[in-house]
Structure formats: structure tokens, C-alpha cells
């Protein structure tokens, strides 16, 4: 199963929300929705390394755990 086939399972923790908002300089509280839109973007590059997926899109890198679909963190490139 790939990340794109499981976007309905993608979530994060309360700490993850704060970390992602801070790292990506986001104003929205819907960081999961924001990240899912980046993951679904046709120009995004998704790779799996070990236990995580890495999504490169619009100048940021989003890290998602491959087994739990938890967004761990996101950074600007």
C-alpha cells in the first residue's frame, strides 16, 4: 500500500501540529489538510526510506511514518 492510497489515514499529534506550523511558517490550524494537499499534488515526489515516506513538494519536505501514517515533521528545503 502506498502513501497516496492511504491519505485518509494521515494524521499527526498535537506536538506535531505545533512543530509543522512553526517549521513551515503556516497560519492555518489544519496542518494535516495542508500536508495532504501537498502529498496529492501532481508535482510532489514521494520516496520511501526505511520506516518513513518523504514527500518533496513546493519547497518543503514532509516526513510521514510508513506504518502509522503519522506526519512526523515537515521542513522548508
Question: Which role does the model predict for each range below?
Answer:
Residues 1-77:
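Ribonuclease/tRNase effector modules and their secretory precursors
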Amino acid at each position: 500500500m502506498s502513501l497516496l492510497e492511504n491519505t485518509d489515514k494521515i494524521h499527526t499529534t498535537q506536538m506535531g501540529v505545533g512543530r509543522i506550523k512553526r517549521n513551515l511558517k503556516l497560519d492555518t490550524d489544519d496542518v494535516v489538510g495542508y500536508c495532504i494537499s501537498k502529498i496529492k499534488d501532481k508535482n510532489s515526489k514521494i520516496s520511501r526510506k526505511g520506516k518513513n515516506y518523504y514527500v518533496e513538494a513546493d519547497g518543503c519536505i514532509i516526513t510521514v511514518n510508513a506504518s502509522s501514517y503519522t506526519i512526523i515533521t515537515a521542513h522548508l528545503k
